[in-house]
Amino acid sequence: MSPSISAEDKLDYVKSKIGEYPNFPKEGILFRDIFGALTDPKACVYLRDLLVDHIRESAPEAEVIVGLDSRGFLFNLLIATELGLGCAPIRKKGKLAGEVVSVEYKLEYGIDTFELQKSAIKPGQKVVVVDDLLATGGSLVAATELIGKVGGVVVESLVVMELVGLEGRKRLDGKVHSLIKY
């Protein structure tokens, strides 16, 4: 942990490292890229601290941290190891071995499928879902449905960045927290 720096200062530092790419992936889109922050060791530590501290305060009952394919994976292991919790991935179709449950969800350009290993979460376990971005909310809705299919209980969805204008939060039930809102 980095106790000598305030949470606000840590967040400001992380924000300063997020890249902005106009007209990517298509004309008229301003793409905000978390990888700029992840290439900076200090920003990585601050980001971990902010996520972990939030879960300690908001979801201390959490037992499993689930990361969404693929950028959510960058955070769930960091958080889980710091808190001494289990972690599990939700992956795109065909990427997980063993018995899985699946759910289809809509994208702005089509349909995709998420999968979760049936053994990853025990019935009744309390789960925090982590991803880099909340946009339309489709992936977090699908993740919540998958976790429910294996008997897990989502206690919170936690994202690094939220694109508020897309109103994805309105599609989600339960607690949702974003570190940065655009």
From Swiss-Prot:
CDD domains: PRTases_typeI. It is found in: Cytoplasm. The keyword NADP does not apply. GO terms for biological process: adenine salvage; AMP salvage; purine ribonucleoside salvage. The keyword Glycosyltransferase applies. SUPFAM superfamilies: PRTase-like. GO terms for cellular component: cytoplasm. Pathway: Purine metabolism; AMP biosynthesis via salvage pathway; AMP from adenine: step 1/1. Belongs to the purine/pyrimidine phosphoribosyltransferase family. It comes from Drosophila melanogaster (Fruit fly). This is Adenine phosphoribosyltransferase. It catalyses: AMP + diphosphate = 5-phospho-alpha-D-ribose 1-diphosphate + adenine.
